[in-house]
Amino acid sequence: MPRACLLTPPDFCVLWRSAAAAALMLLLGGWVFAQGLAFSEALLGWMEREYGVAARDRVIELQELIAASAQISESGRLERVNAFFNRVSYDSDYALWDQKDYWATPFEVLGVNSADCEDYAISKYFTLISMGVDEDRLRITYVKSLTLNEAHMVLAYYPSAEAEPLILDNLTGNIQPAGERTDLVPVYSFNGADLWLAVNRMDGKKVGDADRLSLWQAYQAKLMRQMAVGQ
């Protein structure tokens, strides 16, 4: 059964870092966010060596899903991406990676065919960007699940700047407006550029650059290394 996950609430005194380091990470990470996921024969070979033939085939399926998206409406892209990753089984970071809080890339998720809540949300984020969805419409959102009384992470999609966001969640196959998810209390959200503290279920107050989140910095660098295999 899908579960929320044991995320650690952000300590914003620790998350801030120097402006020079932030600028460097923005330069390194810009290509990832502008272009989305990149696939190559070298990457597929690495997947097979690391995780086996079935994992390689899952990455090919993701590649084909992205390639087919040009003929699909944006709402259709949301539905397909949500369904694609929600079929991956849930497990904790301790069980999967022997760590308290590990953010797995989409390739690692498909490698082990299992994920914690943040892995679902971030994998959906990068896949939708790869399909041409504007990054400004997407926010990876840290919430508290009132049902499970646990920290959780979801992906919010904003049809327009002032619109109520839609929530993509591994706990349910239904994509619902944020106002209907009374079981979730937002804490903060971010995308490739910005970081927001929650004001209500539908909006937040911008407080800086997303690169001030240390896990996000490490995630960007790791994903770039994986996509650069063989180059």
Role assignments for model-derived ranges:
Residues 19-29:
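Bacterial N-terminal signal peptides
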Residues 7-11, 29, 118:
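A general, composition-driven signal for non-globular sequence regions
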Residues 2, 31-231:
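A structural boundary/capping signal
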Residues 2-20:
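Bacterial N-terminal signal peptides that target proteins for export
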